[in-house]
A protein has these predicted regions:
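Hydrophobic packing residues within well-ordered alpha-helices of enzyme cores
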Residues: 121, 143, 147, 171-173, ...
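Active-site segment flanking the S-adenosylmethionine/decSAM binding pocket
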Residues: 100, 106-118, 125, 182, ...
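Conserved SAM-binding strand-loop segment of SAM-dependent methyltransferases
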Residues: 153-161
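Residues at the starts of beta-strands that form the adenosine-phosphate
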Residues: 129, 156, 246
C-alpha cells in the first residue's frame, strides 16, 4: 500500500480531523503491502481496513444545516455519509407545494433515511400524520434524534425501524460506506469497494402499513427505497394504491422497467411525480 493508495481511500471523508485520524491508521499498516502478492489479497486487505474504520467510527455523527422552504433545519447523519446534501438537492423535484394538504392528511414515507422529507413536511404542515419507515438502525436512531433536534411534535411523525417487502421476510441490508441513503436489500452495489458490513432487518408489506395503522386514505406516498419499489408496489393491493392520492419519489434500475412501473402506478394513483435515478443497476 502506497501513500497514493491511502489518499485514494480517505479523500472523500468530509472532516479533516477524522480524515487525518484514518490516514494515520493506514500509515501504521503500510507494511502490509509488502506481503500482498495478488489483487485478491489487496482486495481483502482494503475490505478489512474499511471494516476497522467503520467499527471505530460507526456511532460518530455530524450535523448538517440547511434551509427548506424558508425554514431552518439541522440533521444528524453518519460522519462518513454525503446523503443529506444529495437529498437536499432533490427536494425541489418532489414539488410538495403543489399538494393541497389538509388537517388530518396521512403521509407514508418509505425510505425515510434520517428524516429530511418527513421533518420538512411535519414542520411546514404540523396538522399531518406521518408514518415513516427506515430499516437501517443507525439511520432510524438519527431520525429520532432529528425529530427532537428540530422540535417536532412526536405525535406528528411515527417512525418504524422496518423495511417494506412483498412477503414480510427478514432482509439483509447492504450499505455503501459513504452513503447512508444507499442501503438496499439486493446487494447491488457490487462495484463498490467501500461497503459497510451487512445487517439484518425485519420487514412488513405495503398493505400491512394500512392495516396496522388503520389508514383508509393516504394523501401522499413518498417512496425512495433503492430498488425495493418494484416488489413493494407490484405486490400491493390495488385498492390501497387507489387510496393514495399523490406519489413522490425515485425509481431505480434500467429505463424500461422504471417506465413500466410508473405506468402501472399511474393507473391507480391520481398524481405522480417521480425522479428516475441515474444508476445502472439491473433490477
Amino acid at each position: 500500500m502506497t501513500e497514493k493508495t491511502i489518499n485514494n481511500i480517505v479523500w472523500w471523508i468530509p472532516f479533516r480531523k477524522l480524515r487525518d485520524s484514518v490516514r494515520e491508521v493506514l500509515y501504521s499498516i503500510m507494511d502490509i503491502n509488502n506481503s500482498t502478492k495478488n489483487s485478491l489479497e489487496i482486495t481483502i486487505m482494503i475490505k478489512t481496513i474499511y471494516k476497522v474504520i467503520t467499527e471505530k467510527y460507526y456511532n460518530e455523527n455530524y450535523m448538517y444545516s440547511c434551509k427548506l422552504g424558508g425554514i431552518d433545519f439541522k440533521f444528524y447523519d453518519s460522519i462518513f455519509s454525503g446523503t443529506l446534501e444529495l437529498v437536499f438537492s432533490e427536494m425541489g423535484s418532489y414539488n410538495f407545494d403543489s399538494i393541497n394538504f389538509k388537517d388530518g392528511d396521512v403521509v407514508i414515507d418509505i425510505g425515510g433515511n434520517v428524516g429530511m422529507v418527513s421533518l420538512y413536511l411535519a414542520k411546514k404542515y404540523p396538522f399531518l400524520k406521518i408514518y415513516a419507515f427506515e430499516p437501517v438502525k443507525q439511520n432510524y436512531e438519527n431520525f429520532l434524534k432529528n425529530i427532537e433536534l428540530n422540535n417536532i411534535n412526536k405525535d406528528i411523525i411515527k417512525v418504524f425501524n422496518l423495511a417494506i417487502t412483498k412477503d414480510r421476510r427478514d432482509v439483509i441490508l447492504t450499505s455503501p460506506f459513504n452513503n447512508s441513503g444507499g442501503s438496499n436489500i439486493y446487494d447491488y452495489h457490487i462495484c463498490s469497494k467501500i461497503l459497510n458490513n451487512s445487517s439484518i432487518g425485519k420487514s412488513i408489506t405495503f398493505d400491512d402499513i394500512f392495516t396496522n395503522n388503520n389508514i383508509s386514505k393516504c394523501k401522499l406516498l413518498k417512496i425512495d427505497c433503492e430498488g425495493a419499489e418494484y416488489e413493494i408496489l407490484y405486490s400491493a393491493n390495488v385498492e390501497n394504491l387507489k387510496n393514495c392520492e399523490y406519489m413522490r419519489g425515485e425509481f431505480h434500475g434500467i429505463e424500461n422497467k422504471r417506465e413500466k412501473l410508473y405506468n402501472y402506478c399511474n393507473k391507480y394513483i391520481k398524481h405522480i411525480e417521480i425522479v428516475y435515478s441515474n444508476d445502472n443497476y439491473s433490477l
